[in-house]
């Protein structure tokens, strides 16, 4: 596990509340729309990569999804998510892992990531991610990144920007682009 990145994210989640970080969404509308656009049932296996303290899991539970996994490099982020969910947290599989070191024990019908991929700035990291996704994402993969017009940093870390075309080309060998959407991150 990349100790520098892990320490960074542990500090963020130890010192910041959800309203103090730019990525917090009260309602993860776009993610929910994407997930609902796929022909799946409520027993579909869904993994939220970098989901930490995201409320996506809350909405998925409320909508009856039964097989949800949340993966994050930050144990503190996952603790916050568990605390927010209370007793419902036991319905979720929680995994503390750097995505580039993740060793999935199952496959997923939906691989959702609006928080991690853009932080992979080196080709080796991207290749590791692709190898893991190739094995574990057997249904649909939905990725959110910063566009070429977006920020060059997030939470003080460098990110990699993508156009719809460049992001599609990264995944083209293993995944077909079904749709793309632009959304402004303010």
Regions found by a protein language model. Give the residues of each.
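A conserved beta-strand element that flanks and buttresses the S-adenosyl-L-methionine
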Residues: 112
């Amino acid at each position: 596990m990349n100790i520098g990145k892990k320490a960074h994210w542990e500090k963020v989640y130890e010192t910041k509340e959800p309203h103090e970080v730019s990525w917090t969404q009260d309602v993860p509308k776009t993610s929910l729309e994407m997930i609902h656009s796929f022909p799946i049932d409520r027993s579909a296996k869904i993994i939220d990569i970098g989901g930490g303290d995201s409320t996506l899991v809350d909405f998925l539970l409320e909508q009856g999804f039964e097989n949800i996994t949340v993966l994050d490099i930050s144990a503190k982020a996952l603790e916050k998510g568990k605390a927010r969910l209370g007793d419902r947290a036991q319905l979720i599989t929680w995994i503390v892992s750097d995505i580039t070191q993740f060793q999935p024990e199952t496959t997923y019908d939906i691989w959702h990531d609006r928080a991690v991929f853009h932080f992979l700035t080196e080709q080796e990291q991207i290749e590791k991610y692709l190898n893991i996704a190739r094995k574990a994402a057997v249904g649909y993969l939905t990725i959110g990144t910063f566009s070429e017009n977006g920020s060059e940093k997030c939470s003080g870390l460098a990110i990699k920007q993508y156009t719809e075309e460049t992001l599609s080309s990264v995944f083209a060998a293993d995944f077909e682009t079904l749709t793309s959407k632009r959304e402004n991150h303010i």
